Design a protein with these regions (language model features):
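Gly-rich Lys/Arg/Thr-decorated short loops/hinges at beta-loop-alpha junctions or inter-strand turns
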Residues: 3-7, 68-83, 142-152, 179-182, ...
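N-terminal phosphate-binding or glycine-rich loops at protein starts, especially the Walker A/P-loop
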Residues: 1-52
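Short glycine/serine/threonine-rich phosphate/pyrophosphate-binding segments
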Residues: 14-24, 46-47, 91-95, 115-123, ...
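Short, ordered loop/turn segments at secondary-structure junctions
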Residues: 10-12, 39-45, 79-80, 114-115, ...
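C-terminal non-catalytic interaction/assembly regions of soluble proteins
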Residues: 257-411
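Accessory alpha-helical/coil subdomains and C-terminal extensions
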Residues: 100-102, 108-113, 119-134, 138, ...
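Glycine-rich oxoanion-binding loops at beta->alpha junctions
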Residues: 49-107, 116, 155, 169
Length: 411
């Protein structure tokens, strides 16, 4: 009798993470899986035996299509850090997970997520090998941060980049209507890698002069020099629009947002909660230059804008889910699917497999050779990299003028 599969979603959601879920589900069913279970709220929910049978939820082609076009995590998410299984306390957690997976007759385990989720897959695969388990553990990449190693880019990034490029164009239009001195600072997600903030450069084109300054976390930040640059820019044009990463840091390693408020909150993986960078900088500029300012935080909007997804991104998100299932059924375990770019024009991409050890707890940064000399703008090399990822659209299915989503009441 065919073994069952189980799939979970973890970490921050994206606009296309459910397309990867659809890819895993359909690929498993095509390959003869018994039931396909979903973890409700990831591994944390699984430890509480909170699961659903996806076969009972995704009954029609329309259900699958709705799933692909529904943003955020259909199964719910978590930020649970698995302990070290080499300790007595930690091993008890793995023993419980093994017991639950055994009860469900699981042969294939998929986790859709970013760096921390790949850490989870790596630990489970290692423990599985230790106890002689025949379960195949596979990682499916997802993160708007685009900071996963070995993959050319990560599903979720293309749609977030598209959203950022679009809203930056619209913010620039709004910021220039009065002809008076004004500084608009837009805060964009990105703790240690500036891929999302770099996407603000996509706004530039024949119909838009683009943002005036980009501040990446890869470049040490100096508040005084920042204010001086703004002052120089305002001598040339009254309205300035700046894109700044939430994670810009001073030379001593402190986050800029810490200059305004102590950042005490951390998640299970030890990541500080970052917010307030744009607000601090806007207040500083207003005080020192006696000019009007506005701060805008894109916040969760950049990761859940299902009305503005990239068709390329959705297609590839589905593709990596299917590739993970294919690999698991072929006997692979402890690996992640990566996207390998073949060419830019025409844009072509394929998939490959990499050991989790090459991915987990590592970060891919924006290459500084793609940034101009004074670190305030992106060069054509970045545009050539990013533009193919935002191409084409896949609009939501609208009902009475609003996007129609599929959802699980259990989550």
């Amino acid at each position: 009798m065919a073994k069952n599969a189980i799939v979970g979603q973890s970490g921050g959601p994206t606009s296309v993470i459910n397309a990867s879920l659809a890819g895993v589900y359909e690929s498993c069913k095509r390959r003869g899986a018994g039931k396909v279970y979903g973890m409700l709220h990831g591994v944390a929910g699984l430890l509480e035996r909170r699961t659903c049978v996806l076969d009972d939820k995704l009954k029609t082609a329309l259900d699958i299509e709705l799933l692909k076009r529904t943003p955020s995590s259909y199964l719910g998410s978590c930020r649970y850090k698995l302990p070290d299984w080499h300790t007595a306390e930690g091993e008890a957690v793995y023993q419980k997970l093994s017991e639950i997976l055994g009860e469900l007759d699981i042969g294939y385990f998929f986790y859709i997520g970013g760096n921390d989720s790949m850490d989870t897959i790596g630990k489970l695969a290692d423990y599985g090998a230790h106890i002689g388990s025949d379960i195949r553990f596979m990682g499916v990449p997802k993160t708007i941060d685009n900071d996963l190693m070995v993959t050319d880019h990560t599903p979720g990034y293309g749609s977030a980049a598209k959203y950022i490029g679009v809203v930056m164009k619209e913010i620039i239009r709004d910021a220039t209507v009065y002809g008076t001195k004004y500084v608009t600072i837009v805060e964009i997600m990105g703790r240690n890698a500036g891929w999302l903030t770099a996407a603000a450069s996509l706004a530039r084109g024949e119909d838009c002069e683009g943002v005036d300054m980009i501040c990446l976390p890869e470049v040490p930040f100096n508040v005084d020099r920042f204010v001086e640059k703004v002052e120089r820019m305002q001598k040339e044009k009254p309205s300035i629009v700046i894109a700044v990463s939430e994670g810009v840091k001073l030379a001593d390693g402190r986050y800029v947002c810490e200059l305004a408020d102590d950042v005490h909150a951390v998640d299970a993986f030890g990541h500080k909660a970052l917010t307030g960078t744009a607000r601090f900088l806007a207040n500083t500029v207003a005080r020192r230059l006696d000019t009007k300012t506005r701060c805008i935080e894109l916040s969760t909007l950049q990761r859940c804008a299902g009305h503005l997804t990239s068709r390329t991104d959705i297609t590839e998100a589905y593709q990596v889910g299917g590739a993970a299932a294919k690999a698991a059924f072929e006997g692979h375990t402890g690996e992640m699917v990566a996207l390998d770019r073949i060419s830019n024009a025409p844009y072509q991409c394929t998939t490959s497999l990499h050991p989790i050890s090459e991915v987990a707890n590592l970060e891919k940064k924006v290459p500084l050779e793609w940034v101009n000399a004074d670190h305030t703008a992106m060069l054509p090399e970045f545009l050539a990299y990013a533009m193919p990822l935002i191409q084409a659209e896949l609009t939501p299915i609208y009902v009475e003028g609003l996007p129609h989503h599929i959802y699980l009441p259990e989550t």
